[in-house]
């Protein structure tokens, strides 16, 4: 309900905190509260920012990462990215569909026995395939992922366990919750932010949340080093330096034979979102 309200009320000229306040009131009015401070920003490339002081402008994207905590203290964690105005621009639509396709592929891969680490790599490959179609990536996307090219655009993890804490049992340590004695948590940029890597099991509740984040300072750093230039066309990438970011997130429970998306249907295609604008 919070994200549906986001799609209905967000307009240019509103402040980020104005929208966030209206969304929080929905969670409280339903007898619960938010499961973490609402992330609502037109600077989606700033991961998990809690600053909400900006006036939203037409032509921008608004990223909302918000979940409710029920009276039984179970948490939700959902993200949608919408146009601040009525419609996505052409390039916003293209980038959005890249993320959506990656998310759909990742969700379809979620079933018992599959390493979530491998699903993360699958999503990253889909992201780079999409960017290759726009001339930003060169060569084979899967090989590029093997060289960690995706970490320039997808710096965080695909998802995490969720339960009575939004990052379930995180205080025990991510190595103990998201990994095993045989499967160690990564230590390199990007991979070290993947909270869950182990094989999925029936009953696991997880988030699936790929994104594209164009961080100007990070782009400049890689470009100055000519880092992985065999895979990255920095001249084409320059066109996207101020694009900001997109994330799409849903919550799944792993079943005996696959998965089930939790909650009622929440619009996430371009057509569905624009119909509510």
Predicted regions and their residues:
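Active-site neighborhoods and metal-handling regions in enzymes and metal-associated proteins
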Residues: 1-277
């Amino acid at each position: 309900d919070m994200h549906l309200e986001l799609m209905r009320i967000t307009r240019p000229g509103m402040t980020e905190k104005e929208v966030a306040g209206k969304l929080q009131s929905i969670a409280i009015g339903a007898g619960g509260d938010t499961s973490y401070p609402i992330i609502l920003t037109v600077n989606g490339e700033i991961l998990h920012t809690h600053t909400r002081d900006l006036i939203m402008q037409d032509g921008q994207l608004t990223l909302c990462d918000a979940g409710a905590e029920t009276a039984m203290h179970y948490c939700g964690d959902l993200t949608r990215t919408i146009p601040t105005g009525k419609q996505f621009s052409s390039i916003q639509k293209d980038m959005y569909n890249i993320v959506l396709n990656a998310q759909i592929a990742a969700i379809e891969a979620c079933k018992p026995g599959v390493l979530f680490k491998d699903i993360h790599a699958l999503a990253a490959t889909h992201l780079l395939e999409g960017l290759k179609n726009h001339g930003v990536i060169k060569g084979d996307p899967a090989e590029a992922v093997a060289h960690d090219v995706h970490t320039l655009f997808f710096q965080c993890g695909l998802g995490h366990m969720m339960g009575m804490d939004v990052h379930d049992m995180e205080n025990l340590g991510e190595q103990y919750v998201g990994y095993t004695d045989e499967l160690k948590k990564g230590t390199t940029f990007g991979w070290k932010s993947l909270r869950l890597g182990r094989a999925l099991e029936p009953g696991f509740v997880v988030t699936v949340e790929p994104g594209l984040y164009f961080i100007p300072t990070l782009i400049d750093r890689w470009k100055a080093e000519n880092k992985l230039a065999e895979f990255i066309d920095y001249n084409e990438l320059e066109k996207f330096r101020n694009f900001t970011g997109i994330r799409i997130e849903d919550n799944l429970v792993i079943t005996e034979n696959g998965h089930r998306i939790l909650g009622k249907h929440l619009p996430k295609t371009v057509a569905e979102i624009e119909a509510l604008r």
